[in-house]
Each structure stands twice: as C-alpha cells, then as structure tokens.
C-alpha cells in the first residue's frame, strides 16, 4: 500500500479560501477505502515576520481557532507556525518530501477541484513505479506551453478560458466527468501546487534546493531538471488525467477581514532572490548528472 501525503501551506489571508478547499477535501476523503493511506499535512503559517501581529486587529488565536475545526475525521500531521521556523510554501514542500511517504500531492489554497479528483489520481498512481507525476487536466490555460495538460473538451477554447470564464472556473467543482484518459506526455509540465501528485523518488532525485528559500520557483526547477534527466535517458513519467480538470479561484481571493490584518509581503523579494539562482541551480544539477552519466562504464 502506497502512503500519500497531501501538503498545503496556508497564510492568514488564505484561511477563507482554505475553508472552502476543505469542504471539497472532506468530500474527496469519503471515496477512500481500506486500500488507501492518505494523510494531510497542512501548515498554518503565522510567522510574526510575515504578518505584523502587533499592528493587526485580529490576532493569531483567531486563525488557530478557525483552522483547528476543519479536520474532524481526517488523518493529519498538521502544524501551526507561531515562530520564524517556516518562510513559505517552498520550504514546506522541501521539509515534507523528507517524510516517510511514497508520494505527495501539493495543493495551493486557491485550487478548485472535483471531489472525485483524489480518487482518480490515487488509482492511477498505484499502477506506477519509479519516478512519476500524475496531473489533473486544465481548461485552456495562459498560453500554449500548457497545451499538453488541456482537457479534451477545451482544446479549441481561447487561451485564458480558465481565468476569464467564471462558469468554467467554478464548474471545476461540479463538472460532468464523461470519460478519463490517463495519457503520458512526452515532457514535464506542471504547476507545483495544482493538486499535482508526485512520487517521492522524483523529488528525491531532482530535490528542492535550499537556495530556493522559503518561497521560490521549485516547480520550474523541478521541471527543467527533470527534462535534463529525461534527455540523458532517465525514466520520468508524467501522466495527465484528461477528462477531469482543476482551476484556480481568481475571484474570491480577498478575505472579509483583509483590513484587520497587516501582512508583511516578502513573496516578491523571496521569489526574485530564488529565481535569480534558478538557472545556476539547474546548470549545476545538469553538470553533475552529465558527469555521472558519462562516468558509467
């Protein structure tokens, strides 16, 4: 039996989105059975250097209370960060992949998904070995680089349909699933937190370097490093579930209490710093892999 860990990182301003996500997650867990071993790891990040609690009208306890009631009956190893030990979702992923699970699902708080999604992903993942990724499909995303993941019913739609059409956006929750084809794509393409499932061996292989810090482009790094490995003959599979899609919620992003907390927004600073190191990290990974590859007898 494969053990699966679902990893979600929650900032205070995301608690309302996360509550909506958990409604779907509770439904999704109802389709699990005795052959499934699925655990949630949700990190509520109340780091005082990411939120100015002294200047915030509502305090940490408010979020702890809202958070704590969301998991009744769901197996979890959740954590609440009250100090400066966690700086973002990239760090949470880096720490999570070291835990003794066979595979991981990374999911952002703004993801809208069908209640059957988890069941479909698990069923496909149980048939795979080695390094693999199992992705939902997407309605037409930003540009043609995402075409490999496009749901078969949306291939002729304009780019941006997932963001511009609210019926499509929120339809992710109630979409009619007519058929699903688990198809392998010839490359790697994923958004790290798009309810994407990864084998532990994939992240052990490419890693999430410390240099990417608390918040950075670990998805780009993982994709590009994986592509290098595939060119050298390493077997990394990405399977797309063509027939069931996810979207991001571009509408309900601002919480009702937004004027009552004072975020200290370091995401751009963290991302820019990490992104500036990204190419060198990929080159370093490629160099080591090529050296290892050419050294083989």
Residue ranges and their predicted role:
Residues 3-9, 25, 38-44:
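Hydrophobic targeting segments
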Residues 8-20, 48-50, 87:
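Active-site beta-to-alpha loop of glycosyltransferases that engages the nucleotide-sugar donor
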Residues 14-30, 56-57:
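Short, well-formed alpha-helical segments that are part of the catalytic scaffolds
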Residues 36-51, 82-83:
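Short beta-strand/loop segment that forms part of the nucleotide-sugar
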Residues 52-101:
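Active-site-proximal specificity loops/subdomain of glycosyltransferases
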Residues 102-112:
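Short beta-strand-to-loop acidic/aromatic patch adjacent to the donor-nucleotide binding site
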Residues 114-116, 120-210:
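Conserved catalytic core of nucleotide-sugar-dependent glycosyltransferases
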Residues 184-193, 205-297:
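C-terminal catalytic/acceptor-binding lobe
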């Amino acid at each position: 039996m494969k053990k699966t860990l679902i990893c979600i990182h929650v900032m205070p301003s995301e608690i309302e989105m996360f509550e909506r996500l958990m409604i779907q997650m509770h439904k999704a867990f109802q389709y699990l059975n005795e052959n499934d071993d699925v655990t949630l790891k949700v990190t509520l990040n109340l780091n005082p250097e990411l939120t100015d609690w002294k200047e915030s009208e509502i305090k940490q306890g408010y979020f702890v209370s809202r958070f704590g009631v969301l998991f009744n009956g769901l197996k979890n190893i959740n954590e609440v960060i009250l100090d400066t030990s966690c700086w973002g979702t990239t760090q949470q992923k880096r720490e999570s992949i070291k835990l003794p699970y066979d595979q991981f699902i990374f999911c952002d708080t703004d993801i809208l998904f069908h209640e059957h999604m988890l069941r479909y992903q698990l069923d496909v993942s149980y048939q795979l070995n080695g390094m693999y990724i199992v992705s939902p499909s997407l309605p037409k995303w930003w540009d043609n680089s995402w075409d490999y993941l496009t749901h078969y019913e949306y291939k002729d739609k304009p780019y941006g349909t997932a963001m511009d059409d609210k019926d499509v956006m929120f339809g992710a929750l109630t979409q009619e699933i007519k058929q699903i084809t688990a198809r392998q794509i010839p490359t790697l393409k994923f958004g790290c937190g798009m309810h994407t499932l990864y084998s532990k061996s994939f992240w052990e292989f490419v890693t999430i370097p410390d240099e990417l810090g608390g918040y950075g482009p670990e998805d780009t790094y993982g994709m590009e490093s994986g592509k290098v490995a595939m060119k050298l003959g390493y077997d990394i599979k990405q399977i797309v579930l063509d027939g069931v899609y996810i979207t991001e919620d571009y509408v309900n992003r601002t919480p009702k209490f937004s004027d009552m907390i004072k975020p200290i927004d370091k995401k751009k600073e963290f991302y820019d710093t990490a992104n500036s190191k990204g190419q060198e990290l990929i080159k370093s990974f490629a160099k080591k892999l090529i050296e290892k590859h050419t050294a083989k007898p």
